[in-house]
Swiss-Prot record:
The keyword Thylakoid does not apply. Homotrimer; disulfide-linked. 2 Ca(2+) ions bound at each subunit interface in the trimer hold the trimer together. Interacts with the intermediate capsid protein VP6. Interacts with the outer capsid protein VP5*. It comes from Rotavirus A (isolate RVA/Cow/United States/VMRI/1988/G6P[5]). This is Outer capsid glycoprotein VP7. Keywords: Calcium, Capsid protein, Disulfide bond, Glycoprotein, Host endoplasmic reticulum, Host-virus interaction, Metal-binding, Outer capsid protein, Signal, T=13 icosahedral capsid protein, Virion. Belongs to the rotavirus VP7 family. The keyword Calcium applies. It is found in: Virion; Host endoplasmic reticulum lumen.
Amino acid sequence: MYGIEYTTILISLTSITLLNYILKSITRMMDYIIYRFLLIAVILATMINAQNYGVNLPITGSMDTAYANSTQNEPFWTSTLCLYYPVEASNEMADTEWKDTLSQLFLTKGWPTGSVYFKEYTDIAAFSVEPQLYCDYNLVLMKYDSTQELDMSELADLILNEWLCNPMDITLYYYQQTDEANKWISMGSSCTVQVCPLNTQTLGIGCLITNPDTFETVATPEKLVITDVVDGVNHKLNVTTATCTIRNCEKLGPRENVAVIQVGGANILDITADPTTTPQTERMMRINWKKWWQVFYTVVDYVNQIIQTMSKRSRSLNSSAFYYRV
């Protein structure tokens, strides 16, 4: 009887000892595998350059900062630059080779030949109807004219911002603007815009909805009109739809691949609609020269500093899409 008990105890001790030995062996083996794997990983990491797949976000600045002219060290091999100028510039310079000359000068600033495009427009009114901004970076030169100051301000507001627009059926519906970013943009060869505000009973306030002659005229006749009315109030509209298209638009934010360079004038135009805010000057700058050769020389000299205030975008601005984001 006692022999059986001793045998059982001996077997138990032997099993415990054997199990302990097996566990220690497994532990040493796992440590060996882990340490060896880590050693190999460290060695490979020092020999292989890992690729970082992060996004390189552009940094934009403000033109309130004074910029010095300099040559950009890194060429813009993969970027395109569009320079928009009025026809009077080419007429004044009267040089058939002026574009080639400027292309060679842009080359000294890191812009390869063929990456800079020169786009001519007739005047501010004509450019307002068909502003096509297709390049990675777009610089628009606008000659200051006191008689066209408001047209210049509206055009700058249009091209310096992104707008999400929807069609308006003014024959069937009343419309209201919901907030300050909500505007009605009219564009065409001749736009006359009249509005009649309505009360809660849809009766005209100071006007008759059945008689457009009693409507208030907010624009006549213009090629580009950005209409701002009292928010939260329904309006009946009358627009010369035969020569003009009107859309209900929401300002989404700045279009950072566009900059406007005002040529002449005492001050930079204020393109803000809100009279209580500080005038917007970012990507809106001024060159104070009389001759167009001097204007273009200055643009070439400072082009890379101007580009630093902008961000490269893949979207284009095309009036046929009426400023939809694409």
